[in-house]
């Protein structure tokens, strides 16, 4: 195992899991079966998704992982002799390796799912206590990515303390992101990397590192046990909340939570706000656009979760946005965009309905990306004031100069050249929509 001590851009030092072949340097791009099909999966659906990633041009944009989620194995148990998980022969008649061969032949990579418990979330055999056996199986089958969930944990392996995850999935109230009713809180200075949750995930990390194949490791412990403190030393990404749904309220809530974790995101490790819901449910086109843009600017893993053989052009266009994908995959600058102004609320307000509305981030090309969100339920005007954007406010200014600052600006959605914009850029946005600006040189 090779380790690199890095700084997560501003405040939080982290030990990052570095792979010599560069896998995991930037956030993952791919597709996953769960949001599209739940348990109703088979080899044909997985291979169809892989073919569509190629045919729709998504592979050319960097999408590479085709991930099988829960429900892929025989539910009744493991092979009694080898103790290996058995792929469901009805769903996968040629085994997982047969699907891997087809996916690899397209120049793509195959992912699979398990859990750090006795059973998966859908009740199938999981990997706790079988980490080495399963890691070896995955390697032999040609697996390139493991999503590792947090279901089926026996009571004797639950944590002795409870960590505050200010997420509505448990039905609690979190005033300004605090856990006022938290029971069994850890004592001050407690090292969550020594918790039983962390150890369960570390065991699979070590098993994956012991096999002769690089397997990207995606932790899915829902933000428990202060995973932000040890996730980067354990895997390539880590879920920071409960599950996403195809509703704007849930997307906004997760974006709000993750906005306070951006100092943990950098090369080799990224907080994961869950898979994309673009194309699912009753999300409006602006909501789909805002969802994708926020996830891309946060440098979250971008894992598509909709049936690609029936995706409409408008949703495909969102998922194919080259400027945002270029920002997301920058191989020189690892930090994501940061909120620089909350807009609807005073700065640093924790509000599940109204996340931070103004974000900015640098690129290796010298351009600055600026995102403006309308978190309200009606048309509103938003303004990006150059003097407020951290990456722009000191760029090329002259002391005591009264001349307004101007920058060359491009609309990231349309590619339209917006010309030389002085002082600020103002735009009317539909409910729950975003504007994304690519700000270039001065003019």
Curated annotation (Swiss-Prot):
First-tier enzyme category under EC: hydrolase
Q: What intrachain disulfides are recorded? A: 39-71, 121-151
Q: Which InterPro entries match?
A: Aldolase_TIM, Glyco_hydro_27, Glyco_hydro_27/36_CS, Glyco_hydro_b, Glycoside_hydrolase_SF, Melibiase_C
A GO cellular component term found in this entry reads:
extracellular region
Please tell me where this protein is predominantly located. secreted
Q: What induces it?
A: Expression on xylan is very high, whereas elevated expression levels are also detected on galactose and xylose.
Q: What is its EC number?
A: 3.2.1.22
Is the keyword Chloroplast in the record? no
Q: Where substrate is bound, by residue?
A: 221-225
Tell me which positions the record assigns to the signal sequence.
1-16
A GO biological process of this protein is: carbohydrate metabolic process
**Catalysed reaction per UniProt?**
Hydrolysis of terminal, non-reducing alpha-D-galactose residues in alpha-D-galactosides, including galactose oligosaccharides, galactomannans and galactolipids
According to the record, which residues are glycosylated?
Answer: 79, 156, 176, 181, 212, 232, 282
Q: Does the keyword Ligase apply?
A: no
Q: Which UniProt keywords apply?
A: Disulfide bond, Glycoprotein, Glycosidase, Hydrolase, Secreted, Signal
- Any one GO molecular function term: alpha-galactosidase activity
Top-rank lineage group of the source organism: Eukaryota
User: What subcellular compartments does it reside in?
Assistant: Secreted
Question: Which residues act catalytically here?
Answer: 149, 243
- Function field: Hydrolyzes a variety of simple alpha-D-galactoside as well as more complex molecules such as oligosaccharides and polysaccharides.
Q: Which family does it belong to?
A: Belongs to the glycosyl hydrolase 27 family.
Q: What is this protein called?
A: Probable alpha-galactosidase B
* Organism whose genome encodes this protein: Aspergillus niger
The taxonomy runs: Eukaryota, Fungi, Dikarya, Ascomycota, Pezizomycotina
**Gene encoding the protein:** aglB
């Amino acid at each position: 195992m090779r380790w690199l001590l890095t700084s997560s851009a501003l405040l939080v030092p982290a030990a990052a899991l570095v792979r010599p072949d560069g896998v995991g340097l930037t956030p993952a791009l791919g597709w996953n079966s769960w949001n599209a099909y739940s348990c109703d999966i088979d080899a044909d659906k997985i291979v169809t998704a892989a073919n569509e990633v190629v045919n729709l041009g998504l592979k050319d944009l960097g999408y590479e992982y085709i991930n099988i989620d829960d429900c892929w194995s025989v539910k009744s148990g493991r092979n009694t002799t080898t103790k290996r998980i058995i792929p469901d022969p009805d769903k996968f008649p040629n085994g997982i390796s047969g699907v891997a061969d087809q996916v690899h032949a397209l120049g793509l990579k195959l992912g699979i799912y398990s859990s750090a418990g006795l059973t998966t979330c859908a009740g199938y055999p999981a990997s706790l206590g079988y980490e080495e056996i399963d890691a070896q199986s995955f390697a032999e089958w040609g697996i390139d990515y493991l999503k590792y969930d947090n279901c089926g944990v026996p009571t004797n392996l639950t944590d002795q303390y409870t960590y505050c995850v200010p997420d509505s999935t448990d039905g609690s109230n979190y005033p300004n992101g605090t856990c006022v009713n938290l029971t069994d809180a850890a004592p001050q200075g407690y090292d969550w990397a020594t918790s039983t949750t962390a150890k369960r995930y570390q065991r699979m990390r070590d098993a994956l590192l012991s096999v002769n194949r690089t397997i990207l490791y995606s932790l899915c412990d829902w933000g428990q046990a202060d995973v932000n403190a040890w996730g980067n030393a354990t895997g390539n990404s880590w879920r920071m909340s409960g599950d996403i749904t195809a509703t704007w309220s849930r997307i906004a809530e997760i974006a709000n939570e993750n906005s306070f974790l951006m100092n943990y995101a950098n090369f080799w490790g990224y907080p994961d706000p869950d898979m994309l819901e673009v194309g699912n449910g009753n999300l409006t086109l602006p909501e789909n656009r805002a969802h994708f843009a926020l996830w891309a600017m946060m440098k979250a893993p971008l894992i598509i979760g909709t049936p690609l053989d029936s995706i409409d052009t408008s949703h495909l266009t969102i998922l194919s946005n080259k400027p945002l994908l270029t920002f997301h995959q920058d191989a020189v600058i690892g930090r994501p965009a940061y909120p620089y102004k909350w807009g609807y609320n005073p700065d640093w307000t924790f509000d599940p309905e109204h996340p931070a509305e103004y974000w900015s981030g640098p690129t290796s090309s010298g351009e600055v990306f600026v995102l403006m969100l309308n978190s309200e339920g009606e048309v509103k005007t938003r303004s990006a004031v150059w003097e407020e954007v951290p990456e722009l406010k000191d760029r090329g200014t002259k002391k005591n100069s009264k001349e307004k600052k101007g920058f060359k600006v491009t609309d990231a959605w349309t590619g339209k050249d917006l010309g030389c914009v002085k002082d600020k850029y103002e735009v009317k946005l539909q409910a729950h929509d975003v504007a994304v600006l690519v700000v270039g040189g001065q003019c």
